[in-house]
């Protein structure tokens, strides 16, 4: 992966050059740049599939169905990439773009349904030619490289300020996935999926830790078609997330335009794993919220509370959640805050609260957050809750976010995985991690903030006797007077 990893500097430079073409051409919104590049990557990917099918047909002596019919051969990347600028631009406007938008009604591409309202924004023939040539010069033969290229593009959203909210830092996503350990049987959902970072990382985890599933036709079918679900209300992000998943080798992800907390969302008892960083932007219109979510949260309008209720609704019994929440969810004193905490603690199994430092989402947000991990049971199960006080994530906690040695993430994963051990069970509350019994949490109005339970040890410091300190000060004063006298004699 790119975030936290390395990438061929030559490929990185080529992507930066393409980015600069957009910038100097007047398209400076990072989201718009990525969207336009996404369209072109999709067009290229279609032709790559067609070329592969043609080779297979020759080898097998058959004729399979085609993406491009005879009338649309000029829509193929391999055909128009060498056109002169004016001809390429006219062909893109009049033929290629209308063609890929028309694919939305077919099943020729899992991504095509997100193309129907796509807008071609590249303003000049010369700019289009430069971008096409630039993309054509990036070697994207295998899944890893395709994924890395798209990850690097998306990383530019992180440094873009206003659009940064779409991305959870990659290393935080990876930590959450490793804590939850997705299995080949899981049905994974992110109800506010943004650029699909959680699903991508879950897919990568399965490739690394469950290689055997990719030799099983049934599990491959599940991985490509029925494992990954993502919802969002931003069509641009739907296109970007779909392409991100496809570039990472997930052929047909279920990415849908859906207000997850709205009445129209009929999903219930469907998924086995929620991985999410839902929006915590404030209030939404009560009338648009699903009635059962209103009931669970005591008529809350706050998205951060409504999404927690949503997770309980859409999970199957035994399904698990790892979600980022703002600190206010943990200690908020309103009836609505208490209602959702009580629901999770009393009727399900709250397993862990990982408190994160406020700098994790810098430079674009300084809010303090935590990770909540719980299992839907419908019949309680919370005995005691594991807390961890994370103070370092491997990067400086200022706006620069430079790599540093201090990093609690490996320790968090190790301790969480071994929380049944005697050592972990018996840790003092002065340590990084510790358990708090349910009864104590209930007594504290279901408060889940770590500072409510963490004990601070104040080290006793020994000071010298005042007479000794006074003697030292007087000696210093005597020395100063002596130096001043010497200076006076010289002058």
Predicted feature locations:
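Conserved Class I SAM-dependent methyltransferase catalytic core
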Residues: 33, 37, 233-240, 255, ...
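C-terminal, active-site-flanking charged/polar segments
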Residues: 349-350, 362-412
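Accessory, often C-terminal, charged low-complexity segments
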Residues: 283-300, 304, 342-344, 392, ...
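Conserved nucleotide-binding/hydrolysis micro-motifs of P-loop NTPases
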Residues: 47, 195, 235-236, 262, ...
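Non-catalytic, mostly N-terminal accessory regions of nucleic-acid modification and defense proteins
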Residues: 1-184, 253-265, 355-359, 382-396, ...
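Conserved S-adenosyl-L-methionine
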Residues: 162-276, 281-283, 292, 305-306, ...
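Short beta-alpha connecting loops at secondary-structure transitions
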Residues: 226, 258, 290-296, 356-357, ...
């Amino acid at each position: 992966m790119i975030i936290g990893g390395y990438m061929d500097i030559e490929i990185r430079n080529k992507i930066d050059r393409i980015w600069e073409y957009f910038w100097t051409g007047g398209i400076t919104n990072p989201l718009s740049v990525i969207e336009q590049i996404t369209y072109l990557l999709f067009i290229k990917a279609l032709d790559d599939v067609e070329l592969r099918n043609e080779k297979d047909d020759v080898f097998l002596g058959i004729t399979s169905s085609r993406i491009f019919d005879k009338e649309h051969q000029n829509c193929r990347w391999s055909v128009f990439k060498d056109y002169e600028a004016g001809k390429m631009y006219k062909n893109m406007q009049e033929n290629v773009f209308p063609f890929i938008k028309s694919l939305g009604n077919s099943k020729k591409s899992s991504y095509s349904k997100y193309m129907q309202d796509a807008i071609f924004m590249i303003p000049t023939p010369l700019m289009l030619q430069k971008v096409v040539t630039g993309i054509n010069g990036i070697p994207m033969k295998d899944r890893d490289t395709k994924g890395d290229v798209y990850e690097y593009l998306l990383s530019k959203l992180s440094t873009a300020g206003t659009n940064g909210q779409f991305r959870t830092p990659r290393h935080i996503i990876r930590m959450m996935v490793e804590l939850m350990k997705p299995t080949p049987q899981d049905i994974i959902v992110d109800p506010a999926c943004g650029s699909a970072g959680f699903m991508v990382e879950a897919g990568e985890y399965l490739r690394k830790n469950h290689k055997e599933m990719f030799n099983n036709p049934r599990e491959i079918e599940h991985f490509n078609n029925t494992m990954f679900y993502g919802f969002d209300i931003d069509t641009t992000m739907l296109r970007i997330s779909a392409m991100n998943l496809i570039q990472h080798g997930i052929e047909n992800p279920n990415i849908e335009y859906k207000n997850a907390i709205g009445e129209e969302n009929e999903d219930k008892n469907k998924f086995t794993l929620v991985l999410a960083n839902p929006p915590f932007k404030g209030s939404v219109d009560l009338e648009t919220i699903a009635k059962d979510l209103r009931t669970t949260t005591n008529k809350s309008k706050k998205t951060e509370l409504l999404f927690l209720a949503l997770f309980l609704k859409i999970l199957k019994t035994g399904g698990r959640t790892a979600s980022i929440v703002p600190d206010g969810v943990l200690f908020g004193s309103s009836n609505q805050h208490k209602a959702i905490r009580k629901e999770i603690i009393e009727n399900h199994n709250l397993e862990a609260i990982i408190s994160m430092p406020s700098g994790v989402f810098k430079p674009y947000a300084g809010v303090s957050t935590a990770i909540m991990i719980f299992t839907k049971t419908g019949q309680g199960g919370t005995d005691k809750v594991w807390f961890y006080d994370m103070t370092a994530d491997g990067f400086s906690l200022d706006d620069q976010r430079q790599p540093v040695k201090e990093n609690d993430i490996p320790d968090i994963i190790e301790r969480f995985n071994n929380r049944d051990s005697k050592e972990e069970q018996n840790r003092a509350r002065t340590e990084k991690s510790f358990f708090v019994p349910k009864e104590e949490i209930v007594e504290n109005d279901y408060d889940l903030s770590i500072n409510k339970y963490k004990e601070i040890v104040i080290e006793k410091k020994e000071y010298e006797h005042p007479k000794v300190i006074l003697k030292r000060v007087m000696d210093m004063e005597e020395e100063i007077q002596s130096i001043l006298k010497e200076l006076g004699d010289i002058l």
